Amino acid sequence: MDLIYQNPTDLSHEEAIERVKQELKARNFGVLWEFDMTKKLAEHDLDLGAKFVVLEVCNPQKAHQVLSKDIAVGYFLPCKMAVYEKDGQVFVGTIKPSFLMGQLPGLDMPEIAAEVEEILQATVDALAG
């Protein structure tokens, strides 16, 4: 099973970030934090040579549901999405919740992981170009 689900998009980096936010909102998810990795590295005089932004996203009801079953799931929350450039192409992607949850022994929540994964993948697919 692959860890990452991603697609290229025809949108600019900035447009893709805004569109991800819109798509997530339409699916009852919110962006808790937007981390500009390129900017952070530049503060340390390190040039990444491309734009890379991590979005931490969450649906409070889903988070409560999984945390109530096993607090250790908190290591994987909030869900991560990324918008980045590589070789002149913008990509949008996410880490698959089903893969992450499969890493905790005894954790049995495939339905919840599948629901969240479907939403995140639909968000990525909405930007595919």
Residue ranges of each PLM-predicted region?
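Short glycine-/small-residue-rich flexible loop motifs, especially phosphate/cofactor-binding loops
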Residues: 21, 38, 121
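General beta-strand structural signal in soluble alpha/beta enzymes
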Residues: 32-34
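Terminal, regulation- and interaction-focused segments at domain boundaries
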Residues: 1-28
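Active-site rim loops that border cofactor/substrate pockets in soluble metabolic enzymes
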Residues: 29-30, 40
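Compact, glycine-rich, soluble single-domain proteins
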Residues: 36-82
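Beta-strand/loop substructures that line and gate deep hydrophobic ligand-binding cavities in soluble
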Residues: 80-106
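Well-ordered alpha/beta subsegment
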Residues: 103-129
